[in-house]
Swiss-Prot record:
GO terms for biological process: cell differentiation; male sex determination; sex differentiation. It comes from Orcaella brevirostris (Irrawaddy dolphin). It is found in: Nucleus speckle; Cytoplasm; Nucleus. The gene is SRY. This is Sex-determining region Y protein. The lineage of its organism: Eukaryota, Metazoa, Chordata, Craniata, Vertebrata. PANTHER family: SEX-DETERMINING REGION Y PROTEIN (PTHR10270:SF161), SOX TRANSCRIPTION FACTOR (PTHR10270).
Amino acid sequence: MFRTVNGEDYSPAVQQRNILDFGKAHSLLWTDNGSANDRCETGGNCRESGQDRVKRPMNAFIVWSRDQRRKVALENPQMQNSEISKRLGYDWKMLTEAEKQPFFEEAQRLRAMHRDKYPGYKYRPRRKAKEATEIASRRLFSTVQPNAHRGAVVPLPIQGRLRQGHTFTNGKPVKPLTAHEHKQLTPATGASQQLDKPAPQ
């Protein structure tokens, strides 16, 4: 099933021929006889797998890297995917424009096929749940001040802000923290190492 790879396999002419042969033989965009999971990977109907979205068409780098990633993974089975990606990025940058041209042409062809198959398609990136949680926690942390009475951190009400930059904590004005004081906050515990200073009157 696997073949040995020698140095001649990396010549630009062989790489171009391999990628075009691979695309014709294996791309589901060339044929319509793939499984539901394969169609999902190439932008087909994904309802069987619980995903109801169309994937973006592959760009030139992705077209090139699909075959290259397999080769690198076979040559270096212990190499992590992140390291393979770095290596592929470097290798792609080292290719000349002439060597990249067939992959740009293939990507253009795939884009045209994608446009014909999904005429109303518009790329809509989804925000990951983890990113949304991190953004919400950053917003909450940026609007908290230490409570002078208990040493705990409490969110400030929006109405409690004064024009001079002072805030209210438990109904009493509190001077905002300086940059040095802000660094003393310990995000891991959420507590302050210093009590609030009363606002100047």
